[in-house]
């Protein structure tokens, strides 16, 4: 299975970079992982709603250009469906059984995802009703995908 993570914004913190590298290494046993890091738009402190929409649109266009047509797209969105780790593993396994060999997870920038990206998504996944920094979300996502593969493989994982 191929897993692509399309994300907006660079990781600046060394500890997050190290965690992402660690989970990327661990995932290499289970899948082909590709992380596509896209530039984020600068958001003025007092941006109007129209400016925020324009920023999300620009970021969304970049995201959509980096999603392959054959990918099953899972957008991380606060309004998405919450799943347990086991349910995410089951979903990934079922998608694989049904012939979906390429999963693309999408993480938006600080303003979230543009409506066109959400429309392209085959599934909207929420990790919480809380808002997380997109840099931290990348680490959490990789950990959960790794945990999902361990669950699918019947290997021990921390409950």
From Swiss-Prot:
Would the keyword Cytoplasm turn up in this protein's UniProt record?
A: yes
Q: Which residues of the sequence carry a binding annotation for S-adenosyl-L-methionine?
A: 76, 108, 127-132
Q: Which reaction does it catalyse?
A: pseudouridine(1915) in 23S rRNA + S-adenosyl-L-methionine = N(3)-methylpseudouridine(1915) in 23S rRNA + S-adenosyl-L-homocysteine + H(+)
- Tell me if ATP-binding is a UniProt keyword of this record: no
So what EC number does this one have? 2.1.1.177
Q: Which InterPro entries match?
A: Alpha/beta_knot_MTases, RlmH-like, tRNA_m1G_MTases_N
What does the UniProt keyword field contain?
Answer: Cytoplasm, Methyltransferase, rRNA processing, S-adenosyl-L-methionine, Transferase
* Position of the signal peptide: none
GO molecular-function term, one example from the UniProt record: rRNA (pseudouridine-N3-)-methyltransferase activity
Q: Name one GO cellular component term.
A: cytoplasm
Where in or outside the cell it occurs: the entry states:
Cytoplasm
Q: Which family does it belong to?
A: Belongs to the RNA methyltransferase RlmH family.
Q: How does it assemble?
A: Homodimer.
**What role does it play?**
Specifically methylates the pseudouridine at position 1915 (m3Psi1915) in 23S rRNA.
Stated name of the protein: Ribosomal RNA large subunit methyltransferase H
| Gene assigned in the entry | rlmH
């Amino acid at each position: 299975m191929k897993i692509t993570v399309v994300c907006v914004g660079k990781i600046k913190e060394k500890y997050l970079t190290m965690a992402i590298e660690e989970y990327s290494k661990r995932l290499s046993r289970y899948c082909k992982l590709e992380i596509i890091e896209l530039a984020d738009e600068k958001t003025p402190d007092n941006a109007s709603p129209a400016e925020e929409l324009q920023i999300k649109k620009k970021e969304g266009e970049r995201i959509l250009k980096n999603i392959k047509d054959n990918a099953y797209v899972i957008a991380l969105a606060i309004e998405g469906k919450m799943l347990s780790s086991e349910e995410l593993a089951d979903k990934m396994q079922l998608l694989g059984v049904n012939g979906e060999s390429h999963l693309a997870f999408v993480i938006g920038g600080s303003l979230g995802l543009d409506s066109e990206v959400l429309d392209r998504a085959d599934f909207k996944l929420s990790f919480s009703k809380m808002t997380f920094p997109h840099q931290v979300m990348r680490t959490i996502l990789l950990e959960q995908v790794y945990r999902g593969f361990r669950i699918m493989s019947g290997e021990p994982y921390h409950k």
